[in-house]
């Protein structure tokens, strides 16, 4: 419930109602300056709208201080209309504060800036410490003027998507501070840096180490795809390592986080199957359909996962060329080569998984959900590798139909044994010979071999009940009909 003592208009000064959104009001009524701020949807903190007012903080009653204790300590001059209990330690889905300021100095009231973690053409990333809790965060500081309108659109898109997601392997956005000149994103700190930097130090990862990384990555991408979000720029540089340790087998275990959602898009069903057409991303990670500028779907992310997995295993990308045009030609052909000596120690199961991830035709490519059940990824490499994509299963049968026919023959033999009547079978009443129409149709549709077999059985067992024979015929006819149907498809 909103505080009745506060003005209902979140973009106006509660004393004189003359301020503009995002500006500091110097109230003509002689009251303390008030900064108008607003809350954005979905994250870990919780609320919708609040005002900044030093005077109102002093006037809070005891019950309000009790219910919003953490907030009152955090925001010496910030007040809000409460809708839910606010807690800094709560990391479940709630609300992300998007705080409007008159200048960038306001954020320093909450955080102490430390070392520079990264630097770009129009921004920097700092390590920062929460003054209240001592927790470490990464703060991305962006100069709006230098960034320009196009870059700001990408940043706003990233913020919008990060406000809607909550996954253990996706970077967490804690708060947003914004002034007319700058924007600050307070994000989860990944102290081990980019996955690419870690890999460059090691050369490549072992198969088990790669498996753990791809498991985490597949989980994050399956989550995004389930929410109709396509990343479109998956690469080693956009995967951060929050922490790592060496296990008892001397294998490195990495806790990864997918980041950089500037090129991401959330489908809303405006196009058939949520198809996209914009060519974007990093060339060596681009899927063939993206390069061709054809309609493409979330399956472009799956190709990128394949490229990442390939690089993790051998230390180099699957396709290399001295020009972008030649690189694109290699990608569109999609011919994977395992020529590096390191591939000799990689299992066939891992190589088969790569082939499923990097099918040129996205319709034949494994999905993120299917990848989570992949035999290599789950560690179940004892059973024979079979495709999980429906189209790939059909293609395999078309190329090798004999295997299915052999299976059907074995099943038919088993069924014949099961339904074969015993010599001691008692004779059933004659009225039991009247069978349903469905069984009659099944018997007449059986092929000649089935008829001969039934005839032989009838001669060998003259006292066999017609009901028993009927059931045997139906069971065997079903199996044989399946084989005949497949034979017709091959013709």
From Swiss-Prot:
Description of activity control: Specifically inhibited by CDD-2807 ((3-([1,1'-Biphenyl]-2-ylethynyl)-1H-indazol-5-yl)(2,6-diazaspiro[3.5]nonan-2-yl)methanone). CDD-2807 is a potential male contraceptive drug: it is not toxic, efficiently crosses the blood-testis barrier and induces a reversible contraceptive effect in male mice.
Comp. bias (Basic and acidic residues): 54-82
Feature: compositional bias, Low complexity: 445-457
GO cellular component terms listed in the entry, alphabetical order: manchette; perinuclear region of cytoplasm
Subcellular location: Cytoplasm; Cytoplasm, Cytoskeleton; Cytoplasm, Perinuclear region
Coiled coil, from the record: none
Active site: 233
Catalytic activity: L-seryl-[protein] + ATP = O-phospho-L-seryl-[protein] + ADP + H(+); L-threonyl-[protein] + ATP = O-phospho-L-threonyl-[protein] + ADP + H(+)
Tissue expression summary: Highly expressed in testis, particularly in cells from the spermatogenic epithelia. Present in meiotic and post meiotic sperm cells. Significant expression is detected in lung epithelia, alveolar macrophages, horizontal cells in the retina and in embryonic organs such as heart, brain and spinal cord. Also expressed in pituitary gland, kidney, pancreas, trachea and thyroid gland.
Keyword Hydrolase: no
Positions of region (Disordered): 51-89, 398-491
Other noteworthy facts: STK33 might be used as a target for male contraception: administration of CDD-2807 selective inhibitor causes production of abnormal sperm with reduced motility, inducing a reversible contraceptive effect.
Quaternary structure note: Homodimer.
Family: Belongs to the protein kinase superfamily. CAMK Ser/Thr protein kinase family. CaMK subfamily.
Biological role: Serine/threonine protein kinase required for spermatid differentiation and male fertility. Promotes sperm flagella assembly during spermatogenesis by mediating phosphorylation of fibrous sheath proteins AKAP3 and AKAP4. Also phosphorylates vimentin/VIM, thereby regulating the dynamic behavior of the intermediate filament cytoskeleton.
UniProt-recorded name of the protein: Serine/threonine-protein kinase 33
Gene giving rise to this polypeptide: Stk33
């Amino acid at each position: 419930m909103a505080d009745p003592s506060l003005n209902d208009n979140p973009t106006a000064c509660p004393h004189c109602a003359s301020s503009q959104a995002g500006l500091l009001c110097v109230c003509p009524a002689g009251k303390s300056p008030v900064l108008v701020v607003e809350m954005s949807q979905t994250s870990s903190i919780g609320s919708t709208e609040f005002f900044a007012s030093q005077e109102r903080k002093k006037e809070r009653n005891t019950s309000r201080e009790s219910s919003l204790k953490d907030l009152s300590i955090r925001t010496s001059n910030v007040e809000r209309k409460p809708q839910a209990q606010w807690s800094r330690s709560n990391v479940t889905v709630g609300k992300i504060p998007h705080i409007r300021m008159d200048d960038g100095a306001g954020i320093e009231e909450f955080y102490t800036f430390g070392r520079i973690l990264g630097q770009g053409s129009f921004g920097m990333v700092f390590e920062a410490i929460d003054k209240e809790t001592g927790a470490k965060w990464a703060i991305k500081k962006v100069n709006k003027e230098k960034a320009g309108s196009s870059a700001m659109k990408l940043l706003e898109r990233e913020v919008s998507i990060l406000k809607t997601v909550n996954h253990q392997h996706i970077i967490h956005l804690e708060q947003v501070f914004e002034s007319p000149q700058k924007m600050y994103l307070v994000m989860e700190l990944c102290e081990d840096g980019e996955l690419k930097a870690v890999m460059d130090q090691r050369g490549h990862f072992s198969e088990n180490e790669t498996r753990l990384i791809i498991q985490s990555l597949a989980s994050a991408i399956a989550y995004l795809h389930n929410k109709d979000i396509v990343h479109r720029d998956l690469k080693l540089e956009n995967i951060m390592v929050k922490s790592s340790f060496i296990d008892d087998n001397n294998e490195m275990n990495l806790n990864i986080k997918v980041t950089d959602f500037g090129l991401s898009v959330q489908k809303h069903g405006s196009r058939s199957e949520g198809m996209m057409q914009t060519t974007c991303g990093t060339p060596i990670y681009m899927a063939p359909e993206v390069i061709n500028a054809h309609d493409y779907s979330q399956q472009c992310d799956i190709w990128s996962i394949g490229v990442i997995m390939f690089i993790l295993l051998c230390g180099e990308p699957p396709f290399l060329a001295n020009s972008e045009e030649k690189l694109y030609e290699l990608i569109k052909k999609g011919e994977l080569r395992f020529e590096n000596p390191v591939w000799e120690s990689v299992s066939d199961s891992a190589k088969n998984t790569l082939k499923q991830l990097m099918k040129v035709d996205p319709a034949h490519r494994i999905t993120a959900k299917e990848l989570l059940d992949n035999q290599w990824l789950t560690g179940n490499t004892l059973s024979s590798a079979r495709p999980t994509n429906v189209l790939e299963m059909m293609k395999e049968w078309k190329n090798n139909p004999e295997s299915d026919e052999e299976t059907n023959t074995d099943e038919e033999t088993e069924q014949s044994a099961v339904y074969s009547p015993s010599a001691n079978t008692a004779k059933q009443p004659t009225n039991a010979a009247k069978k349903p129409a469905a069984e009659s149709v099944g018997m007449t549709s059986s092929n000649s071999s089935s008829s001969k077999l039934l005839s032989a059985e009838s001669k060998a067992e003259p006292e066999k009940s017609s009901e028993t024979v009927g059931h045997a015929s139906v069971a065997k006819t079903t199996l044989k009909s399946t084989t005949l149907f497949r034979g017709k498809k091959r013709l």
